[in-house]
Amino acid sequence: AMAISDNIIIMNKGVVAQMGTPEEIYYHPVDEFVADFIGEANFLKGKCSTIDGKYAVLDFEGKKLTVPLREGGMEKGKDYTAVLRPEAAKLGDEGGLECKVEVSCFMGSYQNYHVKIGDTLIKLEDHNPKNRKVYKQGETCSLLIDTDSLHVL
């Protein structure tokens, strides 16, 4: 549907959940159902601790996760969920959120990873593994997230 449509409608239990272009729905889903329905999604849940300009900080699994401000604003002390698509992050040796590699699998055109931060499992796809270090199961590394690629629900 996404490849041949100008607009699509996502329905949940017979009710329109979201209508828009494929890009709008993929990058700006209205809720977890739509985000999960339209593609692979990771849900990073945390409490807002800081708001500064266009960004906020969520306390996520004991770490600080910078996110773009949600449309309509955000409030300190309130719980939010940030949607992270598997292709919107990569692994590195430092500079991000410390994580542990649970799964590392070469898939041909990409390296598939499952990493854990606290109790949260995060799925990643590194679409250029030949030019980067490949992390193995059991290794500790750093999850590098492009802040502006996150979408806060």
Regions found by a protein language model. Give the residues of each.
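Internal alpha/beta loop-helix hairpins
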Residues: 2-63
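Non-catalytic connector elements of ABC transporters
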Residues: 41, 51-153
